[in-house]
Design a protein with these regions (language model features):
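Conserved Walker B catalytic segment
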Residues: 83-151, 160
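C-terminal leucine-rich, beta-strand-based interaction scaffolds used for sensing/assembly
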Residues: 248, 252-333
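Short regulatory helix/loop adjacent to the ATP-binding pocket of P-loop NTPases
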Residues: 152-170
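P-loop NTPase nucleotide-binding core
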Residues: 3, 7-112, 296
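Short, conserved phosphate/pyrophosphate- and ester-handling motifs at nucleotide-, phospho-/glycolipid
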Residues: 6, 213, 322
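Conserved AAA+ ATPase "SRH/arginine-finger" region at the nucleotide-binding site
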Residues: 171-182
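Alpha-helical DNA-recognition elements
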Residues: 15, 132, 223, 304
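Amphipathic alpha-helical "lid/sensor" segments that cap RecA-like P-loop NTPase cores
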Residues: 184, 188-252, 263, 315
Length: 333
C-alpha cells in the first residue's frame, strides 16, 4: 500500500486517450464485507460519475437501474433537488448488480471500471461472490475492468490459482517503486520551481529509508521542502529534524494503536521494529535474541498483526507497514 496505485489509475483516467473515448469509474471496496456493500459502493461510484455528466445519463441511470431505492432531498434555499444512495437502497443485491452491468454495457461509450482493494471480495460473508462477478464480467463486451489491491499475495492467489474463478482472467502487473534515477530529477525540479535546491544525497537517503515507497517519501520531502528557505539548499543536516517532526505529530495515534494490542503482540512488534526487516521470526535464534515466549506465541501474534495491517509480509520477510510507526517504536522502546 501507499506505493501510488490509486494515483496511477487516476493519472490513466486523465489521459486524453482514455478521457475522450471512455467513461471512467473508480470504486474503493476496502470497507466492504458483503455483496450488498459491494453493490452499494459500485452503484454509488457510478451515480457520482453520472452526476457530473450533462448529457441526460442520469435519466438513463434510473431507467435501467430500477431496483435502487434512492433518497431525494430538496434544498430549502435554492429549491434544487439532490439524491443519494444509502446502504438501505440495496434491497436485492444480485438484481441490482445485473442492472448495473446492463447499464455499463448500454452507455454511449465504452466504460473503464477500476475496483480498488479487490482482494476484499475474498472475505465476503457470501461464498459465491467471486464466481458471480466473474460470470458478469465475462459477458461484458464494452466494459473493461482494472482490479487493484494492496495485498499482493491475496491478489496473486485470486488471479493465478486454478481453483479461483478469476484464474488467468486478467494480466497481472506488480507496481514496483519508482526508480531512483527517475525520482531524483523529479524532486529536484520541484525544489527549483520555488527557488530552492536539494542535495542528491538527501533524496537518496530518503529513498533508501522508505524503500522507494511513494507516500512516505512524499511526506518526508514535503517536510524537508518546508524547512528549506528560498535560495537555500536542503542538506543531510535537516533529515533527522524532519523525521522527528513527522513522528512527533503522529505520537498520539501511535500510542493509541499500541494500547489496543496485547502484551505478546507488542513484544513481537517491537522485535520486528528493531530488525527493520525481520526474517525467520519463528526460529529459535529470533525468539531467543528478542526474549520472546515461544515460536507458537510469535506465530499467533503475527497472525493478528497481519490481519490488522500493522505488519506486512513478503515471503519470509516481515516489516512494519507504517514506516513512521516503525521508526517511532525504535526510538521509544
Amino acid at each position: 500500500r501507499r506505493m501510488g496505485k490509486t494515483g496511477l489509475i487516476f493519472h490513466l483516467f486523465n489521459q486524453p486517450e482514455v478521457k475522450d473515448h471512455y467513461h471512467t469509474v473508480f470504486v474503493d471496496v476496502y470497507a466492504s464485507s458483503s455483496l450488498t456493500e459491494f453493490v452499494y459502493f459500485l452503484g454509488k461510484a457510478i451515480l457520482e460519475q453520472v452526476k457530473k455528466d450533462k448529457h441526460g445519463f442520469i435519466d438513463h441511470f434510473f431507467q435501467v437501474i430500477k431496483s435502487l431505492k434512492v433518497g431525494f432531498t430538496v434544498d430549502p434555499v435554492t429549491g434544487e433537488t439532490s439524491f443519494d444512495l444509502g446502504l438501505g437502497s440495496i434491497q436485492s443485491p444480485e438484481i441490482t448488480l445485473d442492472e448495473i452491468f446492463h447499464y455499463l454495457e448500454s452507455m454511449d461509450k465504452p466504460c473503464v471500471v477500476a475496483i480498488d482493494e479487490f482482494q476484499q471480495v475474498g472475505f465476503y460473508q457470501e461464498q459465491h461472490v467471486e464466481a458471480l462477478l466473474r460470470s458478469k464480467i465475462q459477458q461484458c463486451k464494452k466494459t473493461v475492468f482494472i482490479f487493484s489491491g494492496s495485498k499482493r499475495h491475496l491478489m496473486y492467489n485470486m488471479f493465478n490459482s486454478p481453483a479461483k474463478p478469476f484464474y488467468q482472467s486478467a494480466v497481472s502487473m506488480g507496481l514496483e517503486a519508482i526508480p531512483l534515477d527517475k525520482y531524483m530529477p523529479f524532486v529536484q525540479s520541484l525544489f527549483e520551481e520555488r527557488g530552492k535546491s536539494v542535495s542528491p544525497s538527501v533524496i537518496e537517503k530518503v529513498y533508501r529509508k522508505f524503500d522507494g515507497t511513494t507516500w512516505y517519501m512524499q511526506l518526508m520531502m514535503n517536510e524537508l521542502f518546508t524547512s528549506t528557505g528560498y535560495g537555500e539548499c536542503c542538506t543531510e543536516a535537516q533529515l533527522d529534524a524532519a523525521l522527528s517532526g513527522i513522528i512527533q505529530v503522529q505520537d498520539g495515534g501511535h500510542r493509541m494503536l499500541l494500547s489496543q494490542l496485547s502484551y505478546k503482540q507488542k513484544q513481537v512488534l517491537q522485535a520486528i521494529a528493531k530488525e527493520g526487516k525481520a526474517y525467520g521470526i519463528t526460529s529459535a535464534e529470533f525468539v531467543g535474541r528478542h526474549r520472546l515466549t515461544s515460536a507458537s506465541s510469535v506465530q499467533s501474534a503475527v497472525r493478528v498483526l497481519l490481519k490488522k495491517d500493522i505488519l506486512t509480509q513478503q515471503d519470509d520477510c516481515y516489516w512494519i507497514y507504517d514506516y513512521f510507526f516503525g521508526e517511532w517504536l525504535k526510538r521509544n522502546f
